[in-house]
């Protein structure tokens, strides 16, 4: 591509109120232009980056057997009413009527559409599992769009869906997606972490978020070194899977500490860990709660969870027979029952978080329902030694949050991907459809897997930039190589060399047409500034002085290092450089 035939669209100045840095650089480098609040046009440079990200996603999704489809953004309202999300979704769901007064929505997601499609197309259980995905535009009527395309009203997503007649099949696909997302984000060049998450209004039981590190967000994530067990058990907090919990220290949080006093609670745990010279990964806390069941009977329950985890009643209510509200008991409320806390195997029902249950493989647990990922109901537990109960220090008044942060590294993050095991939330209609067609009585479960493609672009910029502009990872750069001929219209040998190299390099598969030849009649300073701003990884500089020595200059954008290469070796040099990157 020649700059004289390209819409470069770089600008020097942008509004001072424009933030964050990724949005500034996307405007300055001519990637996007704002049309209205939360709505953007993608210019050629930005679109080239988007397409390369999409190509990576296509390749990796195809490797695990997902088939691409394309569904309309306009969706009939009756599908959303059937799923119950017509009223649940809120004002972000843009509703409208057509000329015949039929109700529609602009789809923020496509669960309803895909289940309707599968319901009408699938005839037999022999066609399962079904794995489909699309890359498509979504629309959410955000109240406060901000940070450029990071939080916009119109955006591009990859959303995948899988349908299964066996739970194990769903879990295997979920695991494959989990692994493939790691490959996708690493190829793109993102630094990220994975956290267990609440499914929110999408629904389901099991859910993981992929979070990119991003300094300009208020969302904080405690970071652990992660591995993922295929049996859907947990994300461990060490580099290997050999977590051995020799001593189980139970911290009963029955004191009158409010739920908002997270720092106070964590400080107590920290002192417990220091006292026993243990690790936070090896510490379990025991929370006493008061729960009403479906028979309106109130009972005491205990939750055994790892010390670093926060109590989340949204996860707890997913267990059958439990009804909100859930109350954490204070010391006064439970004084008469205090003797029940001295051993873990007491008459008080114990619900063990899945992370704890799977980590404690030295012990035998009975009646664990492995389909419930967040909390496990068990009827019996073994006797455990060295149990500490009711550790409570009421004289602690000042909280040093820095001490807690040393135990749990905190990073600012933003969501770039989300995967769900939806269960039967959307697939019941498919069961009934197939049963009507051929009387197959199936138990279909569903998975959903999303990636925010337009959000990835600014996230990469946030992690890869300097004072001169963007520094694109090689695989998603708008161009892999830039050729800057200095005063090419003044020196004929500079022009001829630039044209010859442009032609030769374009024929090499590893480079192809990913070359930008800056053939403008511009001051060299402007050319260097624009190419650095665009973030093209590899830069070739051709000048009259260097050609006199049969040399050209090569600049690596990431480091800024310039080296001179013999003209007769430059093709081989660039080919090897690009293949290694």
UniProtKB/Swiss-Prot annotation:
Pfam families: HGTP_anticodon, tRNA-synt_2b. It catalyses: tRNA(Pro) + L-proline + ATP = L-prolyl-tRNA(Pro) + AMP + diphosphate. It is an enzyme of class 6 (ligase). It comes from the Bacteria. The keyword Calcium does not apply. GO terms for molecular function: ATP binding; proline-tRNA ligase activity. Gene3D superfamilies: Anticodon-binding domain, Bira Bifunctional Protein, Domain 2. It is found in: Cytoplasm. Keywords: Aminoacyl-tRNA synthetase, ATP-binding, Cytoplasm, Ligase, Nucleotide-binding, Protein biosynthesis. Its main location: cytoplasm. Consists of three domains: the N-terminal catalytic domain, the editing domain and the C-terminal anticodon-binding domain. Catalyzes the attachment of proline to tRNA(Pro) in a two-step reaction: proline is first activated by ATP to form Pro-AMP and then transferred to the acceptor end of tRNA(Pro). As ProRS can inadvertently accommodate and process non-cognate amino acids such as alanine and cysteine, to avoid such errors it has two additional distinct editing activities against alanine. One activity is designated as 'pretransfer' editing and involves the tRNA(Pro)-independent hydrolysis of activated Ala-AMP. This is Proline--tRNA ligase. It comes from Blochmanniella floridana.
